[in-house]
Curated annotation (Swiss-Prot):
Name of the featured protein: Interleukin-20 receptor subunit alpha
Topological domain spans for side Cytoplasmic: 272-553
Extracellular-facing ranges: 30-250
Glycan attachment positions: N42, N83, N91, N182, N191, N200
Biased composition (Polar residues): 334-346
Amino acid sequence: MRAPGRPALRPLPLPPLLLLLLAAPWGRAVPCVSGGLPKPANITFLSINMKNVLQWTPPEGLQGVKVTYTVQYFIYGQKKWLNKSECRNINRTYCDLSAETSDYEHQYYAKVKAIWGTKCSKWAESGRFYPFLETQIGPPEVALTTDEKSISVVLTAPEKWKRNPEDLPVSMQQIYSNLKYNVSVLNTKSNRTWSQCVTNHTLVLTWLEPNTLYCVHVESFVPGPPRRAQPSEKQCARTLKDQSSEFKAKIIFWYVLPVSITVFLFSVMGYSIYRYIHVGKEKHPANLILIYGNEFDKRFFVPAEKIVINFITLNISDDSKISHQDMSLLGKSSDVSSLNDPQPSGNLRPPQEEEEVKHLGYASHLMEIFCDSEENTEGTSLTQQESLSRTIPPDKTVIEYEYDVRTTDICAGPEEQELSLQEEVSTQGTLLESQAALAVLGPQTLQYSYTPQLQDLDPLAQEHTDSEEGPEEEPSTTLVDWDPQTGRLCIPSLSSFDQDSEGCEPSEGDGLGEEGLLSRLYEEPAPDRPPGENETYLMQFMEEWGLYVQMEN
């Protein structure tokens, strides 16, 4: 009963949270008001080698707030959702469902709910997850073995996730039979990268540079739907030094180079010895100086000296004089040579330039002139030069013939001297006429070699006719045969000359009989002349022509 005048007592209301705790059975979650919080976002499965982990992000606006999460999963084809006790009221944003989704041939779903206080969010579901197609293949294990110019890469396929560490390992190669690897190689020296796809577990990289650092990383992939690849860690290895190059360098510097130098030195020594023994140091005679002309294959010889004039020394046996007839013959030969001049003296033009002097070579003539004294000899030489100068026109090229007249000592009687002088004058007239004709022909004939020979003019072996009929061609014996075209100088043997000398029967007064080839080159010293005069001429002849003459006593 209530006391009169006193109000009735009402029970105090309990807090709502306390009422929920009292009403909830012991051990059960307190129900929450759904929809009071936003849902978690980005709910996905992250699977690597069949290790399946569910991931999500916190609800919007609740970052930094202590929110708990509850996860449930669903096997495709069944009717109810299944709870995972380890993933209920957790404060992390991932849940490992590898054991619940270990059958990679099935498909799975998962959902997450956020709880904060008495408020909770609605369930946020993931998409269908197919482990066989969506799991990532982890990188293989890589082992490198280096050589001088190659690197061997050994690959080991990754293993499938194991529930218990004591379980036997299962290779991903057993699950995916078409597993392949993409190997990338980086040359750190040239900074060049190339890739190569392999299906087996061994790869040999050849044709590499020795003593060079190479870095390798490998990716595993399965042909089919695209999936993310996880590359391996970069591993680097340096190739070995090239021992063969060092060995070659040692061979070259220690064997090849010394042997080459030794062979070269011996070759130089052998060549020097051969040249010293077999290659002579002879020089051509000074008289044989080869001069080439303007035309092809036209050459001639010119003596070393410009002009050589040797006066004839006469050995007078009797006093005799040149008759008036001989002098008239000499003048007539000069007149005949002057008549051969094609241009009269009245039409001569003064030369505008100095006359060109050309040498056609020379040959030594042995001229037997029988005179009284040296004065007659000098007069004859001057007469010959004057007659030659008269036959040359001023506007033509002057031709100089160089003669080397050697001394001849002749002993003859007066009658023979007179007859020989006539023959010699006629011969000189013919020679002057031929020289004048060569001077008139022009520059074309200057290129041809002049080849008079050294002849023995034997006056006792010929017969002469009158000066009107002209001198006949005299048979002569060639003592020196010199051909300018071939450059050969031939001297007949002494025996051949002795045979020719035996065929002639000289007179008793002739001092030249049976003296041989060199009788014209030297003479026994006479009582009235120095004994070494002829030897001087012989030595000069040997020096100019480079000859070696051995005289027999």
